[in-house]
Amino acid sequence: MTQPISSRLCLAAALVAALAVGSMVAAERSSSAMATAATRFVNALTPDQRQQASFAFDSDERLHWHFIPTETFPRKGLLVQSMNESQRKLAQELLKAGLSQRGYLTATSIMDLETVLGALEAAGRSVEAQPRSAPLVRNPVGYFFSIFGTPSARDTWGWRVEGHHVSLHFTVVNGTLVASTPSFFGSNPAEVREGPKKGLRILGPEEDAARALLQSLDASQRTKAILDAKAPNDMLTMAKVDISPLSPSGLPAEGMNATQRDLLMKLIDVYTGYMAPDIAADRQARLRKAGVEKIGFAWAGETERGKKHYYRIQGPTFLVEYDNTQNDGNHIHSVWRDFDGDFGRDLLREHLRTVAH
């Protein structure tokens, strides 16, 4: 027996509400694990190291971010290279607190890939987007950990890990994780084509899931999804602090059949799945609450594998950008952004507005 429309709407509303409550409880669990890991990390540092790693929560440094090499974007924080072995393990435990097992493996694999990139560049087998007078130093321990405020299971604080091709940001307000964006992963090379790690594609799922969706589209759908035969040279939002929705948004999910919508959600799952399971569930709950049917998929560039290409996924509240054009189409940049939620700024504004200080 078919339920009345009003009953189905009530059921849908109840489901969204349950997802929201569940994700909030989950976010509190995740923030507690982060607070414990961050406290252990900070307590293991020397006074000088602690000074390098620690910033006021309201410091401008918290919004200072990028994904390019440190030589071209000077960074602050405590460098992994300057940590002893036990401190490095504690830093890794903090990273694990924010990421899933796959996300942690992805982040550390990207860091390790710096060694491969350095060898390729030394042999003249990696194409730079812009020639440099001096080669960049590729360093798998050239990543910085930063703590903003005092880690606590009840208070407001945040943390960041950043270096070439990894930039992860987490913000906790009153003991609840409210933001895990911007979150950036990159890979150069996108595919290792020689040497002991030949065939390695760290961010392969990001490309493969997008191609599966693209290939499922018919000619009419492709005219809406494919924006340009040429891909942009990089992500359009780059490392801006404030971003706005991009136009056009491409083919909306409401214009897809059920199979294609499933492929779209599998693509989104690739990105949410980098985060700890409870953080991923929170992202999923938010985008569903805003309306899956409003999510758009757009592509630019070649459709043949191995060629330069770009895509984006955009909903009412979030944007995913992926670009693979540098190094002759073998260098990926990808990011998840929240239009109002990056760095937790929207909830922080609401918190400051409603709470007396």
Identify the meaning behind each predicted range:
Residues I5-S6, A18, S30:
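Residues at the start of alpha-helices and the adjacent loop-to-helix junctions
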